[in-house]
Every structure is written in structure tokens, then in C-alpha cells.
């Protein structure tokens, strides 16, 4: 398969994995291992990255094996998002940041105005910017025009497990994209992840679908395989949909039974 390129980075895996809500560190580590994810994301606000006394996933992981993707979850406006991003960068984690500015506490949908503003500010600061956005086609285009390094439209609300509720909009975003499109939020099953890849997405970021599964380790492996299968299917090219049947066996040379 073709590698996933985000800014200056290249990855074999197209699965980006969140690190929250796992039952314990052991399950988390095993799930990460079997997923073969190379990019791990985490909320900076949920980890005291400057307090050595506070346990966190960075103590348990061989961070040299992964590209860390801090996110700005908890930010309510662009200024807060930029402040969180700078904290992550100051800790030496990474200059790649997932911009997440929530505009509604019930749906956890992103604030489009503040997301645009935060993305522009962080680009000016030299960050590699991956904004979490809705499936708004125009907003995705405006983010792309700013110069973001990837676009991360939600399949459905965060943690909902509803899967892709608006495949048409998602396909429009993918068709117009000149940067990678990473489907983020709402993925509930391997079928959802495969569908995203079959639509032409460049990758999938998920968390709850794995960490909240009855067996997170098995689900992590299932997600890995479904994303690989979906991407291979997209690259191979599906057959055209037709209203009428077409025989799969050749008819030439067949004898006629009278």
C-alpha cells in the first residue's frame, strides 16, 4: 500500500489510535501493539506532562517507537487551543498538533470559527496542524486553503459509535482534498473503519471503539485489519454498480442443452 504522508512524516499504518479510557495500562499497551499504529494521540489537559510524580502513558510506552499527536481537547476557543499546543511543544513531545475546539458540550461538535482561527494561529507558529472538524464541506476547504497538513472530519459525534452518518459529505471532502483526510470520531466498528477507507479516506483516528470494546485487544487488531482491507479495496477500485445482473461466467463457447 502507498504510505500515509502528513507534513514531513510518513507512516505505514493508516490507523491513528487514541490512548484514553482503556481499563489499564497493560491492556492499553497490548492494544497499541496489535494495532500496529504509529501515531498515538492524547489530550494534553488530561496529563500533567510537567509533573514527574503524576503517572501517565508516556512513562509506560517506548515513545521512540511512535509519533505522538497531542490534542487540544478541552479548549473552548482558539487562544486556549494555542496555549495547550504550546505546552505540548514546550514539553518536547512533538510539533504536530491535533486542533480540537469544542463548540457544543452536548454534541461535542467543533466550533468552526474558533477551529479556523486556532489553525491559522498555529500554522503561523510553525506547527504541523491537523484540525478536527465536522463534515462541513466548505469548512474543510477553508481549512485546506489555510495550509493545514491534514483534515480530520468526524464520522459522527465523538464517542457515539454511530459510524459514518453522512457519507456523501465525507466523499465530497475527500474528492476536493489536496491534503490527507483522516476520519476522526464516531467510528464504532471495523465495518465503519473499512467504509471510511473505501470512500477514499487516507486514514482513521479512533479511540472509544477500541478502549470501550469488551475485548480492546481483539478490537484493535480488527480495526487494523479492516483499515488495511478498506484501503486495499479503494486502491484496487470497486466494480461499477448496475441496476441489472451481469453473468460472472463467460457465455462464449457454452453448449446449448436442448
Curated annotation (Swiss-Prot):
It is found in: Cytoplasm. GO terms for molecular function: thiazole synthase activity. It catalyses: [ThiS sulfur-carrier protein]-C-terminal-Gly-aminoethanethioate + 2-iminoacetate + 1-deoxy-D-xylulose 5-phosphate = [ThiS sulfur-carrier protein]-C-terminal Gly-Gly + 2-[(2R,5Z)-2-carboxy-4-methylthiazol-5(2H)-ylidene]ethyl phosphate + 2 H2O + H(+). It is an enzyme of class 2 (transferase). One of its GO terms (cellular component) is cytoplasm. GO terms for biological process: thiamine diphosphate biosynthetic process. Its EC number is 2.8.1.10. Gene3D superfamilies: Aldolase class I. The active site is at residue 98. InterPro entries: Aldolase_TIM, Thiazole_synthase_ThiG, ThiG. SUPFAM superfamilies: ThiG-like. 1-deoxy-D-xylulose 5-phosphate binds at residues 159, 185-186, 207-208. Pfam families: ThiG. It comes from the Bacteria. Coiled coil: none annotated. Belongs to the ThiG family. Homotetramer. Forms heterodimers with either ThiH or ThiS. This is Thiazole synthase. It comes from Bacillus thuringiensis (strain Al Hakam).
Amino acid at each position: 500500500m502507498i504510505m500515509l504522508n502528513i507534513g514531513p512524516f510518513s507512516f505505514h499504518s493508516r490507523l491513528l489510535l487514541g490512548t484514553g479510557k482503556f481499563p489499564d495500562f497493560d491492556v492499553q499497551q497490548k492494544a497499541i501493539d496489535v494495532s500496529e499504529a504509529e501515531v498515538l494521540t492524547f489530550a494534553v489537559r488530561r496529563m500533567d506532562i510537567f509533573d514527574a510524580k503524576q503517572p501517565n502513558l508516556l512513562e509506560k510506552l517506548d515513545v521512540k517507537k511512535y509519533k505522538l499527536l497531542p490534542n487540544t481537547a478541552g479548549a473552548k476557543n482558539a487562544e486556549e487551543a494555542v496555549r495547550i499546543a504550546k505546552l505540548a511543544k514546550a514539553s518536547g513531545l512533538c510539533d504536530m498538533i491535533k486542533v480540537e475546539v469544542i463548540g457544543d458540550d452536548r454534541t461535542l461538535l467543533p466550533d468552526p470559527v474558533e477551529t479556523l482561527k486556532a489553525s491559522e494561529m498555529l500554522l503561523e507558529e510553525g506547527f504541523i496542524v491537523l484540525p478536527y472538524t465536522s463534515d462541513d464541506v466548505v469548512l474543510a476547504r477553508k481549512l485546506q486553503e489555510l495550509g493545514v497538513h491534514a483534515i480530520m472530519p468526524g464520522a459522527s459525534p465523538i464517542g457515539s459509535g454511530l459510524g459514518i452518518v453522512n457519507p456523501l459529505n465525507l466523499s465530497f471532502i475527500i474528492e476536493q482534498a489536496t491534503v490527507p483526510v483522516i476520519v476522526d470520531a464516531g467510528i464504532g466498528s471495523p465495518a465503519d473503519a473499512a467504509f471510511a477507507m473505501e470512500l477514499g479516506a487516507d486514514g482513521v483516528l479512533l479511540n472509544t471503539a477500541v478502549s470501550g470494546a469488551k475485548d480492546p485487544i481483539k478490537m484493535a487488531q480488527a480495526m487494523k485489519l479492516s483499515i488495511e482491507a478498506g484501503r486495499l479495496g479503494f486502491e484496487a477500485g470497486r466494480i461499477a454498480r448496475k441496476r441489472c445482473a451481469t453473468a460472472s461466467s463467460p457465455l462464449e463457447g457454452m453448449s446449448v442443452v436442448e
